[in-house]
A protein has these predicted regions:
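Short, conserved catalytic-motif segment at the N-terminal edge
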Residues: 5-68, 90-93
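Alpha-helical scaffold elements that line and support the substrate/ligand-binding pocket
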Residues: 37, 41-42, 67-90, 115, ...
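Active-site helix/loop module of the DD-peptidase/beta-lactamase fold
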Residues: 62, 67-71, 85-127, 146-147, ...
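Active-site Gly/Thr loop motif
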Residues: 217-281, 310-366, 399
């Protein structure tokens, strides 16, 4: 067996998780990754391995921090849930009651629930004129979003708000927080700091570069050929049609969100709540673990936890996502399990995958928080075979 740098710890009974994680490096060509699991508030898996910098060969260390791309959306949604729990926000209220400028151009009756569940028809970014990294910060784009016009009748169907969902959550948080904090500050001060968890939406200047994993993504013809089979064919067709909702919601002509740009501090230090969250993977698992175990430290209300754990309320036309071009289930900012995209042990699970195969979620059935982060970004979202293998091993250990 090839030598591989895998370190960390697993509790008794979870040895198979460590074995499967090691196989990701010896058999499945994982570059660098970390995985952590918390159950009932206690850490049972804390593993890391490979290299944090695929260019220099620097080894992944215990406190390496890694970007998790769209998994960031789940943490933004957790901040939204905390705001609901504290009575600052109501999922059933119209967005315009918190953000009057939003209530124009057919958006007057959109509820917070519809917006956070990707049903509002506000996914497209092709008219936003995003030219530089700073333009991706919520503070810079919110006024443009207020004037947007829905692409479909809100509530009739859904489509992944790939870039915009985090901005909308961020602006709502700023408007309802009595202190007017940004989402990144609200999350850090009310959730991450309370749980002693290092995860940021907006990286502080105090974090040294040496702790940051370097991402290697799809940035050359050779890389495209290597990973093209990982991207669903229907989505590829969408990317190739510039008039499709897929292209208009996801294609980035200026390449601002190209994978390699997440190696640049000017990208990581802004607040782009749909995609630039970064932290220790154990921190991600511990945060979801707090929600999965009832949120006692954060004093979460039972009603908001019931909402997060409830089956998704699908739009009138059903589960087909008109941006991702597959059947998906969303609820108040999170992915929910659905056939073909399952995770957790029942419909009560909630979380979010990210580009290349990161995944962070809560499984209330086991009071479990799970996180997997990596730095080799291919075409997978939630069906990365490396992450899946480790996740399945976790559940075999729970039987």
């Amino acid at each position: 067996m090839a030598q591989v740098h895998v370190q960390g710890w697993v509790a008794a009974g979870f040895e198979e998780v460590e074995e499967e994680f090691a196989r990701n490096f010896t058999k499945r060509k994982q570059t660098g990754a970390a995985c952590a699991v918390y159950i009932q508030g206690k850490k049972v898996v804390d593993l890391w391995g490979g290299v944090s910098d695929p260019y220099s060969g620097t080894l992944w260390q215990e406190h390496t921090m890694v970007p998790v791309f769209s998994s960031t959306k789940g943490f933004a949604a957790l901040a939204g849930a905390l705001a609901v729990s504290r009575g600052l926000l109501d999922y059933e209220e119209q967005v315009g009651s918190y953000w009057p400028e939003f209530a124009v151009n057919g958006k007057e009756r959109i509820t917070v629930r519809q917006l956070l569940s990707h049903q509002a028809g506000l996914s497209t970014v092709d008219t936003l004129q995003l030219e530089k990294f700073a333009d991706l910060d919520t503070s810079q784009v919110a006024n443009k979003l207020a004037n947007a016009r829905p692409e479909w009748t809100p509530g009739v169907k859904h489509g992944y708000h790939a870039w915009t969902i985090g901005w909308y959550i961020g602006e709502l948080i700023r408007r309802v927080d009595p202190r007017g904090r940004s989402l990144g500050r609200f999350f850090h001060e009310e959730i991450a700091s309370s749980l002693d968890a290092e995860f940021y939406i907006g990286l502080p200047a105090s974090v040294p570069d040496a702790r940051l994993a370097q991402v290697r993504g799809i940035n050359s013809p050779a890389q495209i050929l290597k990973h093209i089979h990982e991207i669903p064919f229907s989505m590829l067709l969408g990317f190739l049609n510039p008039r499709s909702l897929t292209a208009r919601s996801m294609v980035d002509p200026k390449r601002l969100v190209a994978n390699e740009n997440f190696n640049r501090r000017e990208m990581l230090e802004i607040e782009f709540p749909s995609g630039n969250g970064i932290g220790e993977v154990r921190a991600m698992a511990s945060i979801y673990g707090e929600f999965a175990a009832g949120g006692k430290k954060l004093k979460l209300s039972k009603s908001v936890l019931r909402t997060l754990e409830a089956p998704p309320e699908l739009p009138l036309s059903g589960a087909y996502d008109h941006v991702n071009r597959t059947k998906l289930a969303y609820s108040v900012g999170f992915w929910k399990p659905i056939e073909g995209h399952t995770f957790g042990s029942s419909h009560r699970a909630y979380g979010h995958p990210g580009a290349g195969g990161s995944f962070c979620y809560a499984d209330p059935d086991f009071e479990l928080g799970y996180a997997y982060g990596l730095n080799e970004i291919g075409g997978y979202m939630d069906n990365n075979p490396r992450e899946n293998a480790v996740r399945q091993a976790v559940y075999r250990c729970l039987k």
